[in-house]
Amino acid sequence: MLVVDDEPGITRVIEAAARELGFEVAAINDTDQFENAIETIKPTIIFLDIAMPGRDGMELIGYLAARNYPGKVVMMSGSDERYIQMSSTIAKTRGLWIGGTLAKPFRKQQVVDLLKSLATGPTEA
């Protein structure tokens, strides 16, 4: 699992929830590290902040779509929830599996619940 977020506090919450459930997790806080992390880690789940400094989430979504990324993506942002939903819709039309969305700030239990559903339940195409 890969967490892509520029806020260390958010990253720590997701990492703690993931490790609690037995996931191996890596985190990056800079979009310049994104491609290398995808190729090296080969994550099956990505938590992606769509409003980071540098390249925006849509550019990173484009990178994943161009490579037919087979895993699940969780879109998250501190922006308006409509922006998260719009970004998720665009990602779906580009062929990505959106496993859920998170509006910041969120609680650790929300991440735990989402990860449990990703591990056992259906996903959206």
Regions found by a protein language model. Name each.
Residues 96, 115-125:
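The C-terminal output helix
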Residues 82-83, 103-119:
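C-terminal output helix
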Residues 27-45:
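Acidic, metal-coordinating helix/loop segments flanking the phosphotransfer/catalytic sites
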Residues 1-9, 14-18, 46:
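Conserved acidic segment of CheY-like receiver
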Residues 39-41, 64-70, 93:
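Conserved phosphotransfer cores of two-component systems
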Residues 52:
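Receiver (REC) domain active-site loop signature in two-component systems and cognate sites
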Residues 29-30, 56-62:
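Acidic catalytic/metal-coordinating carboxylates
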Residues 59, 79-100:
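Alpha4 helix (beta4-alpha4-beta5 surface) of REC/receiver domains from two-component response regulators
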